[in-house]
Amino acid sequence: MAGNTIGQLFRVTTFGESHGLALGCIVDGVPPGIPLTEADLQHDLDRRRPGTSRYTTQRREPDQVKILSGIFEGVTTGTSIGLLIENTDQRSQDYSAIKDVFRPGHADYTYEQKYGLRDYRGGGRSSARETAMRVAAGAIAKKYLAEKFGIEIRGCLTQMGDIPLEIKDWSQVEQNPFFCPDPDKIDALDELMRALKKEGDSIGAKVTVVASGVPAGLGEPVFDRLDADIAHALMSINAVKGVEIGDGFDVVALRGSQNRDEITKDGFQSNHAGGILGGISSGQQIIAHMALKPTSSITVPGRTINRFGEEVEMITKGRHDPCVGIRAVPIAEAMLAIVLMDHLLRQRAQNADVKTDIPRW
C-alpha cells in the first residue's frame, strides 16, 4: 500500500489499523533544537479522541502518545521522530457479522476490489482511527509554526445538517462538545444529535480552518500550489467530500468587480481568495472549508451485497459517531499545519535571501 506519506521536507508517514495493536507515525524534517514533550502533543489528541462526550463514539481510547525517537534532553535532534499510540479498547467481535458483507457507503467494497482482501475490523486502515497520528504529527507542526513564526491555526464547526453556524466567538469553540463558535446554536445542535441517536441515523457537517499570521510567499507553482496542497491534505481526511478555499463555490455568483481582493496602501480590502493568490500565500488569513458526509455506520437497515454477490439487508453495529464532523476539527487543524510547515521549510530552503520593498500587512 502506497500513499501513506504527506509532505516533501516536513514528511509524515503513518501506519496502523483501527483494531491493530497500535498506531504510529514517523515525522521527518523537524529542525533541531525545538523543545518537545509528549504533553505538547497530548492536548490536541485529547480534543480528537473518542469517548469524550455523549455525541461521539463511545469507544474509549486514552490515545496516550509515546515519543520513541528524535528527542534528546527535551529537544528535537533533527532526526526522525517516531510516535506510537496503543489501541486499548478494540471490540472486534462487533464486526464478525460483516466480514463477508460490504457496508454501503464504506471502503469495504473498494478495498476488496483493490487488494483482494480487507481487514473488516472497524474498517482497518480505512478507519478514521488512523487520524490520531496525523493529529500528533500536526501538533509538532503547530508548535513550530506558533513559536517560530507566530502562526495560529484554529478550526471550528460551521454547519451541521441544515443548521448554519456563524463564527461569532472563537473562545466558545473549546467550551462545548461541538467545537461550535456560535453559542446561540448549541441547543439546536444538541436537539439534532439527540434525534439522530434515537433514530439510529447520522448527519453531515462543514468544518472551517483558519491560519493567521502566515507570511506571504508560501506555495510552489504550478503543481504544488499552496491551495492545491491544502485541498489535497483536507480531502485525505475520512468522509471529506469537498473542499473550498476562501469563498469557494460561492464565487460562481460573483462578478469580477466583486470578487477581486482590492489593495490599498492600508492592505487588502477583502479576502475572497482565502489568503492565497496564484497558489502563493498573500499574507492574509488562510481560510479553508471542508464538507463531511454523514457516516454510513448507522442502525437504519440498508441494502447491499456480500462477497458472493448475494443481496442482503444490514445494519451497522458497533460504536460510531452520529456526526463525524465534530471530531474532524482537530484533524483539519493538523493537516493544515502539516502543509504550512512543509511549505515554510521549502520557502526557507529556496528563497531565504529574497528581499522585497513591497508592503506587507
UniProtKB/Swiss-Prot annotation:
> What protein name is recorded for this chain?
Chorismate synthase
Q: Which domain of life is it from?
A: Bacteria
Listed GO molecular functions? chorismate synthase activity; FMN binding
- Entry binding sites for NADP(+): 48, 54
Q: What does the note under cofactor report?
A: Reduced FMN (FMNH(2)).
* Family designation: Belongs to the chorismate synthase family.
PROSITE patterns the UniProt entry points to = CHORISMATE_SYNTHASE_1, CHORISMATE_SYNTHASE_2, CHORISMATE_SYNTHASE_3
Subunit structure, briefly?
Homotetramer.
Family annotation (InterPro entries): Chorismate_synth, Chorismate_synth_AroC_sf, Chorismate_synthase_CS
Cofactors required: FMNH2
* UniProt KW keywords: Amino-acid biosynthesis, Aromatic amino acid biosynthesis, FAD, Flavoprotein, FMN, Lyase, NADP
GO-annotated biological processes: amino acid biosynthetic process; aromatic amino acid family biosynthetic process; chorismate biosynthetic process
Question: EC annotation?
Answer: 4.2.3.5
